[in-house]
């Protein structure tokens, strides 16, 4: 029975008759879809580009083993209709960034709810909802931490009002089959440690994923591959740990299986390599027969500086380190007795040697630049697992905030943070007053404008298009023209129209210090004015930098005025917190679902938000604090 029967009549009618959009059918999306139909929502559009992976099954409860390889959106719809057949659900197996889903598409809905796992899609939906003037409920989880917030044009901050740290997210099949970044190999190496020496986890399998949907063009082929994988695993295979034990943890046999045989198997999945550079297997004997090489960083014409942990070695050295670490870990495991397990610790030298060597060997196989032990240690310590109960709590809060919006009580909406532990006031859920729009936001301001520092003699039009306009400012199909009185077109969204400009330097078009560019994305109904600040003093490997990010521009007086404006008429007397950085242990920023994206996730125990805490019993003065994101937390990862 739908809960709408207990709602006020007008709200119940809005719930039953209104059309809502859910973007994402993963960890949060499954819980949210279930909550919506049980609350009485009857007209739901659901969109997700992803397909179901085995690793999803432990928490994305609308999916079963038989669904592996199929569309998440379609299967979620089918599963929900089994227990609520009256619902009218439209499922799209597609990207929300497809131009078909334009402003008019978004205007069909009374409410949009995000259950996404990557920054680019979040930015895009944020802009589409602003353009369509449709309320958006944004959400995210990372481990035990979660967050829900409401975004409404002209009333609240938008998703991009304040810069966020780099998000890193990625699916399990990327880890096992098609790594493209060093962090993918580092995660794989940590999984391998647990498979060999620690507690085995089916979600941390390291062998090639034969059920990878990308390796099959048709869903039926993916399902057949999954069945073959399961049958083969049940009959012919034993666990990785049992196999390793049967070899006596022989380093050469382990090396051959992981870096030669498994890679050769990946190469048989030829569809994976049609648009990727294929991996190159390593042979133990060939590696050992190599002469002593210089360090990898020397090969890349970089000076060999710093401590030993900051040096990048050659393949032969990492192969030897791999062998030595296995021997040491085997002894440690034997000393603990039968049935014992080792726990990976980045401060354990042997465990760190193992992950460093295994990760670097895999990087070499997949044609990536290898990393130092120091870099790998910093990245390997920031991996966050997905937790089903966190997704469930956040999905419930999304619906509650949605009911407030449909009741016409958006002033009662809050940003709500879910904490790992109760705060000093014994609360796990901490509500915060919504902030008003940032007047300097380059997305939702009345006249979005930003300044970019770069070297006009070095930066190409292609860099401007891909790294600045698309990646940094999240445009999908930009048109860029120079404000030179002529309207010179620099970049066109029409394919091939300005391709000849790609490798030309900006200076070749008369762009210099003080030049202004107008970037338009007609899909997002978004225009951004870019001021060019020429500089020849950028740091090494820095192509550009955005000058004066929006949060840094907001002065104390502006912040105080904004705080007053949002508390006027509030029944609970919500006021900005006077808490110091050390006291705000209960307020956290979360920006990933449960996985890519990604990552990457944007959260840690040490991160704090600019939001204001609510406390019904205390009269707090209007003073805001902001905790700077710690640089070393940029690679916190949420895994799917």
UniProtKB/Swiss-Prot annotation:
Q: Which GO terms describe its cellular component?
A: cytoplasm; nucleolus; nucleoplasm; SUMO activating enzyme complex
Question: Which sequence positions carry the modification called Phosphoserine?
Answer: 207, 507, 592
The places in or outside the cell where this protein is found are: Cytoplasm; Nucleus
Q: Which GO molecular function terms does the record list?
A: ATP binding; magnesium ion binding; protein heterodimerization activity; small protein activating enzyme binding; SUMO activating enzyme activity; SUMO binding; transferase activity; ubiquitin-like protein conjugating enzyme binding
Annotated cross-link Glycyl lysine isopeptide (Lys-Gly) (interchain with G-Cter in SUMO1) - which positions? 164, 236, 420
Residues of the active site are: 173 (glycyl thioester intermediate)
Q: Where is the composition biased (Basic and acidic residues)?
A: 222-231, 551-563, 606-630
Q: What is the effect of changing residue 72 to A?
A: Abolishes ATP-dependent activation of SUMO proteins
Q: Where is this region: Disordered?
A: 202-231, 551-640
**Primary place of residence?**
cytoplasm
Q: What sort of enzyme, by top EC class, is this?
A: transferase
The residue ranges flagged as biased composition, category Polar residues, are: 565-582
What InterPro entries does the database record attribute to this sequence? ThiF/MoeB/HesA, ThiF_NAD_FAD-bd, UAE_UbL_dom, Ub-E1_IAD_1, Ub_act_enz_dom_a_sf, Uba2, UBA2_C, Ubiquitin-activating_enz
- PTM details? Sumoylated with SUMO1 and SUMO2/3 and by UBC9. Sumoylation at Lys-236 inhibits enzymatic activity. Sumoylation at the C-terminal lysine cluster plays an essential role in nuclear trafficking.
Give all N6-acetyllysine modified positions.
271, 613
Positions contributing to ATP binding: 24-29, 48, 56-59, 72, 95-96, 117-122
Instruction: Name the consequence of residue 24 to V.
Output: In ACCES; loss of function; does not rescue the abnormal phenotype in a zebrafish disease model
Q: Which clinical disorder is mentioned?
A: ACCES syndrome: An autosomal dominant syndrome characterized by a highly variable phenotypic spectrum. Clinical features include aplasia cutis congenita, thin scalp hair, dry skin, dental anomalies, ectrodactyly, and skeletal and neurodevelopmental abnormalities. Craniofacial, cardiac, renal and genital anomalies have also been reported. Affected individuals have early growth deficiencies that improve with age.
According to its UniProt entry, the function of this protein is described as: The heterodimer acts as an E1 ligase for SUMO1, SUMO2, SUMO3, and probably SUMO4. It mediates ATP-dependent activation of SUMO proteins followed by formation of a thioester bond between a SUMO protein and a conserved active site cysteine residue on UBA2/SAE2.
Q: Which family does it belong to?
A: Belongs to the ubiquitin-activating E1 family.
Matching entries from PANTHER family are given as: SUMO-ACTIVATING ENZYME SUBUNIT 2, UBIQUITIN-ACTIVATING ENZYME E1
Q: What is this protein called?
A: SUMO-activating enzyme subunit 2
Source organism:
Homo sapiens (Human)
List the top taxonomic levels of the source: Eukaryota, Metazoa, Chordata, Craniata, Vertebrata
């Amino acid at each position: 029975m739908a809960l709408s029967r207990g709602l006020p009549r007008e709200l119940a009618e809005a719930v039953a008759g209104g059309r809502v959009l859910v973007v994402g059918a993963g960890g949060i999306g499954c819980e949210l879809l279930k909550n919506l139909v049980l609350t009485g929502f009857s007209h739901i559009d659901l969109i997700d580009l992803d397909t179901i992976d085995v690793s999803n099954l432990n928490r994305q409860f609308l999916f079963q083993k038989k669904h592996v390889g199929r569309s998440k959106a379609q299967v979620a719809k089918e599963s929900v209709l089994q227990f609520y057949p009256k619902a009218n659900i439209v499922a799209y197996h597609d990207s929300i960034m497809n131009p078909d889903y334009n402003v008019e598409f978004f205007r069909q809905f009374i409410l949009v709810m995000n259950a996404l796992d990557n920054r680019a899609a979040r930015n895009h939906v944020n802009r589409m909802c602003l353009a369509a003037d449709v309320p958006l409920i944004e959400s995210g989880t990372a481990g035990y931490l979660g967050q829900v917030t409401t975004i409404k044009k002209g009333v609240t901050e938008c998703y991009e009002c304040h810069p966020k740290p780099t998000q890193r997210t990625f699916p399990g099949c990327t880890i096992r089959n098609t790594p493209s970044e060093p962090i993918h190999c580092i995660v794989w190496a940590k999984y391998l440690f647990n498979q060999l020496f620690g507690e085995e986890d089916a979600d941390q399998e390291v062998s090639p994923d034969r059920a990878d949907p990308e390796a099959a063009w048709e869903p039926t082929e993916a399902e057949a591959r999954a069945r073959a994988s399961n049958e083969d695993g049940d009959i012919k295979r034993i666990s990785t740990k049992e196999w390793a034990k049967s070899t006596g943890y022989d380093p050469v046999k382990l090396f051959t299986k992981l870096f030669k045989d498994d890679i050769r198997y990946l190469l048989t999945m030829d569809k994976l390599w049609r648009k990727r550079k294929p991996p190159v297997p390593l042979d133990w004997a060939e590696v050992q027969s190599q002469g002593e090489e210089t360090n990898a960083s020397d090969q890349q014409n970089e000076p060999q500086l710093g401590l030993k942990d900051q040096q990048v070695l050659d393949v032969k050295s990492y192969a030897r380190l791999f062998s030595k670490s296995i021997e040491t870990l085997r002894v440690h495991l034997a000393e603990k007795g039968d049935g014992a397990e080792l726990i990976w610790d980045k401060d354990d030298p042997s465990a760190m040697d193992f992950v460093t060597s295994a990760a670097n060997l895999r990087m070499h196989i997949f044609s990536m630049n290898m990393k130092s032990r120091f870099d790998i240690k910093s990245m390997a310590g920031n991996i966050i697992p997905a937790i089903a109960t966190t997704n469930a709590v956040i999905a419930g809060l999304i619906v509650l905030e949605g009911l407030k919006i449909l009741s016409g009580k958006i002033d009662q909406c809050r940003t709500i943070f879910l904490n790992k532990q109760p705060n000093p006031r014994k609360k796990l859920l901490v509500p915060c007053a919504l902030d008003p729009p940032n007047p300097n936001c380059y997305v939702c301001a009345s006249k979005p404008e930003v300044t970019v520092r770069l070297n006009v003699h070095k930066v190409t039009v292609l860099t401007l298009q891909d790294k600045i306009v698309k990646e940094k400012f999240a445009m999908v199909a930009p048109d860029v023209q120079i404000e030179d009185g002529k309207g010179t077109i620099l970049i066109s969204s029409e394919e091939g129209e300005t391709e000849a400009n790609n490798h030309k330097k900006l200076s070749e078009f008369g762009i210099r210090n003080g030049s202004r560019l107008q970037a338009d994305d007609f899909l997002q109904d978004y225009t951004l004015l870019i001021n060019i600040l020429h500089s020849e003093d950028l740091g090494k490997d820095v192509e550009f930098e955005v000058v004066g990010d929006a949060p840094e521009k907001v002065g104390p007086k502006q912040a105080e005025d904004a705080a007053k404006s949002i508390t006027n008429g509030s029944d609970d007397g919500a006021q900005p917190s006077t808490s110091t950085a050390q006291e705000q242990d209960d307020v956290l920023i979360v920006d990933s679902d449960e996985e890519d994206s990604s990552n990457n996730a944007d959260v840690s125990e040490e991160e704090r938000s600019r939001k204001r805490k609510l406390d019904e019993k205390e009269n707090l003065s209007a003073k805001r604090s902001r905790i700077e994101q710690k640089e070393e937390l940029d690679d916190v990862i949420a895994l799917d």
